[in-house]
Amino acid sequence: CRIRVAAEAEEREFYTHRASQQWLDALAPLGTNEHKPFLVSASCLIAIFLKKFSYDANGDRLKNYYTSESVGIATGLLINALHNAGVATLTHTPSPMRFLNEILERPSEERPFLLLVAGFATEKAMVPDIARLELAQIMTTIS
């Protein structure tokens, strides 16, 4: 799978040259590394792109506003829908992800946002138990 080969190349670069030791220490409990076999074994890979600008009929460039926010919200809704349908998901964001433009033949004005891995988890799948803050810790109510 060309996506796996390219993603693992970026991940190798990240783990060996880009990431600080502090970042690597934070990732250690999750057991992540440059090997991404799930990119081949998953039922589905969904490449999500955002489009920072478009062109009008005259070929003039037009800025698209709030693309990261819009795509982030839409992706969250998709993940929630998949989970409600019993499908496991994993967000994967190798950086940079421009290799997806080439492999998937997407135009340069589109920027990869996220690679969403979806499918039915294997028996060996490890889902980390990451503690979340309580709502009262992150919410302020104004009367």
Predicted regions and their residues:
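Glycine/small-residue-rich phosphate/adenosyl-binding loop
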Residues: 1-71
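Short hydrophobic/aromatic-enriched beta-strand-loop microsegments
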Residues: 13-15, 110-115
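Solvent-exposed alpha-helices and their adjacent loops that cap or buttress functional pockets
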Residues: 37-40, 105-108, 131-132
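Short gly/pro-enriched beta-turn/loop segments at secondary-structure junctions
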Residues: 39-42, 84-85, 111
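Small-aliphatic-rich amphipathic alpha-helix that forms the alpha element of a beta-alpha
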Residues: 46, 52-103
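Short, electropositive alpha-helical surface patch
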Residues: 99-113
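C-terminal helix-cap and adjacent tail motif
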Residues: 114-143
